[in-house]
Amino acid sequence: MTNSYALSPAIIAAVRPPASQDYLVAASLSGRKSINSSSSSIFVPISLSTSYGRSKCAFSISRKNPKSTIRCDIAVKSAASVDADADLSSSTSLETEEDEKAKEKIGARVRVTVPLKVYHVVRVPEVELMGMEGFIKDYVVLWKGKKISANLPFKVQFVKEIEGRGPVKFFTHLKEDEFELIDP
């Protein structure tokens, strides 16, 4: 985490060497950042962390209000929560095994075994899925690189013949117990 210190340009001018009149360069975790010193205050990001948590602090001095303020929020982990995090790593490996088994099903042919209706097929009021066959296109457990708990993790593609339109392709998300795998 990064923290910010706000310093007035007068303080910066008194402290910095004369060769750097235009910009103050501050190092941060994400790299180096140039900050214009002509603004009313300057924020210099820093990082504070301990073995049990992270601290987020802000120190500010402004021209309008000469009083300085320091504000800190600290997130601290107890020893029990550190142990719990270690236990979660073993359960995470079990989840990845389940995910790998489910991802092996991608591309498999399936048949819907429960009575389901969908209402999102264009120009068709409703479509009954019971007994329809389709293909598993995706197993949705990651969104933008983060693990999510999807209620309907299997994305299944169906093709239905509609009178006057020909075959219409649509997708539906299903649970694992709502379909059965068909042997090729």
UniProtKB/Swiss-Prot annotation:
Disulphide-bonded residues: none
Signal peptide: none
Subcellular localization, as worded in the UniProt entry: Plastid, Chloroplast
InterPro entries from the UniProt entry: Elect_transpt_acc-like_dom_sf, Fd_thioredoxin_Rdtase_alpha, FTRV
Main location: plastid
One Pfam family hit: FeThRed_A
GO molecular function: oxidoreductase activity
Span of the transit peptide along the chain: 1-71
Superkingdom in the source lineage: Eukaryota
GO cellular component, one term: chloroplast
Keyword vocabulary terms for this entry: Chloroplast, Oxidoreductase, Plastid, Transit peptide
Subunit organization: Heterodimer of subunit A (variable subunit) and subunit B (catalytic subunit). Heterodimeric FTR forms a complex with ferredoxin and thioredoxin.
Function comment: Variable subunit of the ferredoxin-thioredoxin reductase (FTR), which catalyzes the two-electron reduction of thioredoxins by the electrons provided by reduced ferredoxin.
Similarity comment: Belongs to the ferredoxin thioredoxin reductase alpha subunit family.
Protein name (record): Ferredoxin-thioredoxin reductase subunit A2, chloroplastic
Species the sequence originates in: Arabidopsis thaliana
Gene name linked to the record: FTRA2
